[in-house]
UniProtKB/Swiss-Prot annotation:
One of its GO terms (biological process) is microtubule-based process. Coiled coil: none annotated. Keywords: Cytoplasm, Cytoskeleton, GTP-binding, Magnesium, Metal-binding, Microtubule, Nucleotide-binding. It comes from the Eukaryota. Residues 427-440 have a biased composition (Acidic residues). GO terms for cellular component: cytoplasm; microtubule. This is Tubulin beta-2 chain. CDD domains: beta_tubulin.
Length: 447
């Protein structure tokens, strides 16, 4: 089972959409009753739902925020009544887009009541796989309190998987000037405490809506529609029986060659605007093509500027595994320079028999590409520009933070960027003696 946690305004909005999609796919109506048409919908329903005494299905979801607003709108939304009422945990003060408030002051006061609810949900599970957290990194609650919660859960359940869906701030779609601070402080935490981070980015989502879906003025609703489709795709092999049943751990084993490099780019195909799905049947070659297209990536980094360490594709619908494998091989052979050669067979694909609502087939792409450093680099530059002048710092030190923490977060993020760069440049045939010598020096320097 997976316990789902959503925090902050963004996390709650995305999370609410995610549950709408998942409920639709499993044939569960807003009151939690099942009205679907195939047993497959119920076969692994317990991954995300608890079955209550009267035959109702209740999401294993915890909703938290430091102000009541967003949660009220979730509660009054289409599926608001399906959640367990005790699982709404909220404060009144808000975090005011301040990471320190979410992580150290306001959030720290609320965290124990959130942990109680998480514990209750975890105790309800027979065999807990792990946790998935939806949050944004630009604000105060999702980033500050979200990372606080992740580190607390890490302490209490050290051997369970921790997956995050993290929305990174983007230069074009920004609501606060301190986003780079909040994001850097969060990444500092995610590198250490999360197992897998699915990186989403408003700018990239915005571009997809604008360019591919031809929406002239995309709303957050449209962006969240994309996110929820992708989240549903990433998790579909956990929710439905497929030929290759994956769980969070198998996903991690295939995708993470080095523990710190666990930030994934996501892609989705077919991208059609909401109204036009039914007109053309897509073929496996077409969705494979579209899925690998850099314009389809949900974060603002171009995979052609780096190399894939690993990648994984999840195809949904009735299709032959053979055809899928051929298409995937085809992509790798044509673009071999974009894959590191020192991890052979670094692309895996799985097929899940049940397509998303309204489509015959679809695919979701998860890639671990070194080009994601572009995004960290971008945030880091913005961070440095402000931090050099200590701009806005008093909001954080006023909550008891120390400048040292900023410096550490900054250097951790820069280390991450250079690690990605190092593996991007690495080849299979490098002179091994040199490497050993370097390692030897490094070890001695560190001592």
């Amino acid at each position: 089972e997976i316990v789902h946690i959503q925090g902050g305004q963004c996390g709650n909005q995305i999370g609410a959409k995610f549950w709408e999609v998942v409920c639709a796919e499993h044939g569960i109506d807003p009151t939690g009753r099942y009205g679907g048409d195939t047993d497959l919908q119920l076969e692994r329903i317990n991954v995300y739902y608890n079955e209550a005494s009267c035959g109702r299905y209740v999401p294993r979801a915890v909703l938290m925020d430091l102000e009541p607003g967003t949660m009220d709108s979730v509660r009054s939304g289409p599926y608001g009544q399906i959640f367990r009422p005790d699982n709404f945990v909220f404060g009144q003060s808000g975090a005011g887009n301040n990471w320190a408030k979410g992580h150290y002051t306001e959030g720290a006061e609320l965290i124990d009541s959130v942990l109680d609810v998480v514990r209750k949900e975890a105790e309800n599970c027979d065999c807990l796989q792990g946790f998935q957290v939806c949050h944004s990194l630009g604000g105060g609650t999702g980033s500050g309190m979200g990372t606080l919660l992740i580190s607390k859960i890490r302490e209490e359940y050290p051997d369970r998987m921790m997956l995050t869906f993290s929305v990174f701030p983007s230069p074009k779609v920004s609501d606060t000037v301190v986003e780079p601070y909040n994001a850097t402080l969060s990444v500092h935490q995610l590198v250490e405490n999360a197992d897998e981070c699915m990186v989403l980015d408003n700018e990239a989502l915005y571009d997809i809506c604008f360019r591919t879906l031809k929406l002239t003025t995309p709303s957050f609703g449209d962006l969240n529609h994309l996110i929820s489709a992708t989240m549903s795709g990433v998790t579909c092999c956990l929710r439905f029986p497929g030929q290759l049943n994956s769980d969070l751990r198998k996903l991690a084993v295939n995708l993470i060659p080095f523990p710190r490099l666990h930030f994934f780019m996501l892609g989705f195909a077919p991208l059609t605007s909401r109204g036009s799905q039914q007109y053309r049947a897509l073929s496996v070659p077409e969705i494979t093509q579209q899925m690998w297209d850099s314009k389809n990536m949900m974060c603002a980094a171009d995979p052609r500027h780096g190399r894939y360490l690993t990648a994984s594709a999840i195809f949904r619908g009735k299709m032959s595994t053979k055809e899928v494998d051929e298409q995937m091989m085809n992509v790798q052979n044509k673009n071999s320079s974009y894959f590191v050669e020192w991890i052979p067979n670094n692309v895996k694909s799985t097929v899940c028999d049940i397509p998303p609502t309204g489509l015959k087939m679809a695919s979701t792409f998860i890639g671990n590409s070194t080009s994601i450093q572009e995004m960290f680099r971008r945030v880091s530059e913005q961070f440095t520009a402000m931090f050099r002048r200590k701009a806005f710092l008093h909001w954080y030190t006023g909550e008891g933070m120390d400048e040292m923490e900023f410096t550490e977060a900054e250097s951790n993020m820069n280390d991450l960027v250079s690690e990605y760069q190092q593996y991007q440049d690495a080849t299979a045939e490098e002179d091994e003696y040199e490497e050993e010598e370097e390692d030897y020096h490094q070890e001695h320097d560190e001592m």
